[in-house]
Amino acid sequence: MPKIHDSSCTSGLTPSQRSHVLAEALPWLLHYRDKIVVVKYGGNAMIDDELKRAFAADMVFLRAVGARPVVVHGGGPQINMMLDKVGLEGEFRGGFRVTSPEVMEYVRMVLFGKVGRELVGLINEHGPYAVGASGEDAGLFTAEKFQPEIEGELVDIGRVGSITDVDPTSLFDLIDAGRIPVVSTIAPDDDGLVYNINADTAAGALAGALDAERLVMLTNVPGLYTDWPNKDSLVSSLTPAELEELLPTLDSGMIPKMTACLDAIHNGVKAAHVIDGRVPHSVLLELMTEGGIGTMISSESYEH
């Protein structure tokens, strides 16, 4: 059965939590040494200045202790602001952004030119560590047009794609050089048309291709709820089989994240985590403490 989370672990970074990080960190520091950790950067952590800096510091910390972090990001709020600024109406169908060729140019500009560059800059305030990349670079991602089924019919939503292939060679080169790749989720198809890729999906696919130790998803909730909005239903850990059983019952916004976690695990990732990006240093609190602060999906007998 899924393990229910102690909600007291979801508060902010208190002095007690800091002391626990110090006391519990050693075995986890050893565990993650030379291991790849893919982190999907999203939610409030992307728009709050304090959280942005805390996240960047977490990535530098992981690198400093010998782990190999890779960041994958989207940029929904920033894209919305840009489209509003230039007078383009943001249209959604079935929860998916309709992405015309004109909108795609702004998506590309915002993801790689704004969101990615900003995070690279924040990380590099600590040293020359981060390098920006996109799915277009060195064949990292190959995509095809994605058409969702809405009310029983396939719908054309423009330049929205799904990943058909991942070639992580260029990222391995960066990782081996001690860099922190920051990946924007845009990708070309075989004909060179560029598509916007769901960042959750891209992070899951990339984690599998990199043979990552962990996949970490930042969200705006403390973790996975089996009965949203019942806060007592927050789950601390569960197996892939348990998650597959729960998947059809979950809130629609959580399904892409959970599907990406399952895909990553099915492709060899040891464990996936869904955490609250509104908590400063949430990545370290999840990975470097015994209890963690979010939800872990793993078929192995890891402590959280």
From Swiss-Prot:
Q: Provide the E.C. number(s) assigned to this enzyme.
A: 2.7.2.8
Superkingdom classification of source: Bacteria
Q: Give the signal peptide, or none.
A: none
| Residues that bind substrate | 75-76, 97, 196
State the reactions this protein catalyses.
N-acetyl-L-glutamate + ATP = N-acetyl-L-glutamyl 5-phosphate + ADP
Record-level Gene Ontology MF annotations: acetylglutamate kinase activity; ATP binding
Q: Which Gene3D superfamilies match?
A: Acetylglutamate kinase-like
User: Which residues are annotated as site, described as Transition state stabilizer?
Assistant: 40, 257
Q: Which InterPro entries match?
A: AceGlu_kinase-like_sf (IPR036393), AcgluKinase_fam (IPR004662), ArgB (IPR037528), Asp/Glu/Uridylate_kinase (IPR001048), Glu/AcGlu_kinase (IPR001057), NAGK-C (IPR041727)
Mention any one GO cellular component term assigned to this protein in its UniProt record: cytoplasm
Q: What is stated as this protein's family in its record?
A: Belongs to the acetylglutamate kinase family. ArgB subfamily.
| Function as written in the Swiss-Prot or TrEMBL entry | Catalyzes the ATP-dependent phosphorylation of N-acetyl-L-glutamate.
This protein is called Acetylglutamate kinase
Source organism per entry reads Corynebacterium urealyticum (strain ATCC 43042 / DSM 7109)
